Regions:
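Active-site C-terminal subdomain of aminotransferase-like
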Residues: 136-230
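Short loop-beta-helix segment that forms the pyridoxal 5′-phosphate
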Residues: 84-121
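Short, acidic, Ser/Thr-enriched surface-loop or helix-capping motifs
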Residues: 30-31
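Conserved PLP phosphate-binding loop immediately N-terminal to the Schiff-base lysine helix
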Residues: 103, 118-153
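Active-site nucleophile and cofactor-binding loops and adjacent substrate-binding regions
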Residues: 70-77, 93-100, 153-155
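Active-site-adjacent loop/helix segments that line or gate small-molecule/cofactor pockets in enzymes
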Residues: 1-27, 47, 76, 82, ...
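Conserved C-terminal alpha-helix-loop-beta "cap" of PLP-dependent enzymes
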Residues: 34, 127-130, 134, 140-144, ...
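Glycine-rich phosphate-binding segment of PLP-dependent enzymes
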Residues: 36-37, 41-74, 81-93
Length: 274
């Protein structure tokens, strides 16, 4: 119970951010006009920024056709083919309305008498032997161990976006069928996969290492806090005071944005005592 209470308290840290009036690129603006550099990026969903114009235009065009409902769509196949370009060994694709539906499907597939299947996060620690399911995050080096199930964190900046599960091996064919989801949202997911290649042209090690320091252990663009769990809320609040938002969940990951100035990250170095 104490552990659950601590997790709840950490998730509530985001409530300490003043009301957000707008979000643009990699910044949040509160109702007073103060700007915050966002290193949380909605857990990775906002890796393209909070307002990727091309992606949002495609979604808007689908909405204008009335395709906001949960309908069958050829976009399911397009999404599977796009994912096949980045995860060729995990060709069994399921699309679920939300993470709760995905985890329920995963639990049903793994067996009713098995404990809940946790999703390992390679941004926090390398995937070890025996891991059944893990998140897949862009811009991380290949993992030595490939679990049977991967859940891609796709950069579609919407909390209501569907989530995708990719499996490999004959047993993964027994995964529960996909949910019907809005073709408009599927359009956003397809576009987000293709956008990763374009982002790679301007987002890499030279940029990521600019935030290196004693506060973090970095894997690619992902930052794992080095402090103890009991110290994390204090770190979150101190950075919030100087205009930086990090992941409200310990130990992260926080994420290096694709656009920032040297001045914006000076508080990170000052806080680390550099």
């Amino acid at each position: 119970m104490a552990e659950a209470a601590q997790i709840h308290a950490l998730s509530d840290l985001m409530r300490e951010l003043p009301s957000v009036r707008r979000a643009r690129d990699y910044h949040l603006y509160d109702f007073r006009g103060k700007r915050y550099l966002d290193l949380y990026l909605s857990g990775g969903r906002a890796l393209l920024g909070h307002r990727p114009d091309h992606l949002l235009l495609l979604v808007k065009n689908q909405m204008a056709k009335g395709l906001s409902g949960d309908f069958p769509s050829p976009l399911e196949g397009r999404l599977a083919r796009a994912l096949g370009q980045i995860l060729p060994e995990h060709g069994i694709v399921r699309i679920y309305a939300n993470m709760e539906r995905l985890l329920a499907a995963l639990a049903a597939w793994a067996g009713k008498h098995q404990p809940p299947v946790p999703l390992a996060d390679p941004a926090i620690a390398p995937i070890g032997e025996g891991v059944l399911a893990a998140l897949w995050r862009p811009f991380l080096p290949p993992q030595g161990v490939q679990p049977e199930i991967l859940v891609p964190v796709l950069p579609f900046p919407a909390a209501f976006a569907p989530v995708v599960l990719c499996g490999r091996g004959d047993s993964a064919r027994g995964l529960p069928p996909s949910d019907l989801v809005s073709p408009a949202l599927l359009t956003g997911l397809v576009a987000s996969v293709h956008a990763l290649a374009r982002l790679a042209e301007r987002y890499g090690e030279e940029q990521w290492r600019m935030v290196d320091g004693p506060l973090w252990e970095r894997r690619g663009p992902y930052l794992r806090a080095r402090c103890e769990k009991e110290q994390y809320a204090g770190l979150f609040r101190r950075l919030l005071e100087v205009g930086i938002v990090i992941n409200p969940q310990y130990p992260g990951p926080s994420i290096v944005p694709a656009l920032f100035s040297g001045g914006e990250i000076k508080p990170l170095r000052a806080l680390a005592g550099e």
